[in-house]
Amino acid sequence: MHARIIHYICGENHINVAILARRSKPIVALISDFDGTLSPGNMQEFGFIQAIGKKPQEFWQESDDIAVGQDASNILSYMKLMFDEARKAGIKLRREDFKRFGTSVELFDGVKEWFKMINEYGKSKGVKIEHYINSSGLAEMIEGTEIASEFKRIFACSFIYNKEGEAEWPGVAVDYTAKTQFLFKINKGILSVRDNKKGNESQAEDIKRIPFPHMIYFGDGETDVPCMKIVKMFGGNSIGVYNPENKKKINVAKKLLRQHRVNFIAPACYTYGSRMHQIVCTIIDKIKADFELTKLAKHI
């Protein structure tokens, strides 16, 4: 039945019914951390740290020292250190420079093919798939990776640039609690980091663009716990991702599952037929089935 006709005959309930009628298929959001989840290391370790003449362990220790010494944000501390060390090394930090470093970022097995594979599976089931990044890494570096175009929105740290195009100040700093705000933005279909007005407006659950039960969150560590917990608590699914070659990461994933922070854990292998592939496809099947049952229950 056409949405306008339903609008006419349904009286006080016309708004919600019309919206549901327009939703011929559910939208499923795959929301992923980046470092340790899609990539085997921190993105700064694939070119930038080497360019400033340091070793990864040395860089991160100096960043931690700033945070501890100043009782400051770990995120802002690493962003400041990038500024300071780049200046010492005579490296300009323009958006295109960050993107260039991003081209060297390594990805886990199957990641490059993952998006097309899952998109096609969703399409075959009558489900629209959307991919999002929710990371404490740098948006500009992620934009330089070969998978950047796969994401509807990259929520991550970023810089403010001067008239010469050089980074001069942190624009967005995303720590483990700040990550949670982006779940609610995705929930309401808000893509702007700056927009707080729409994010704080009350909105009925049945008109939100992507309900939490239609979210799948991927993360590798304890900094993802708030997001994992929120998605799981509101009916979505959280997957603890681990590098199968890293015993520490395996133990972290097992701990997350044991503490009921996640629904599933899986090695960071995104190839066809992998455990990750099986879990995600099965979740998509369930979301589609629940969507159809809800429509039947509302007699549409």
Predicted features along the sequence, with ranges:
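Alpha-helical substrate-recognition element adjacent to the catalytic core
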Residues: 5-163, 256, 262
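C-terminal cap/substrate-recognition subdomain and adjoining C-terminal extension
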Residues: 106-132, 136-300
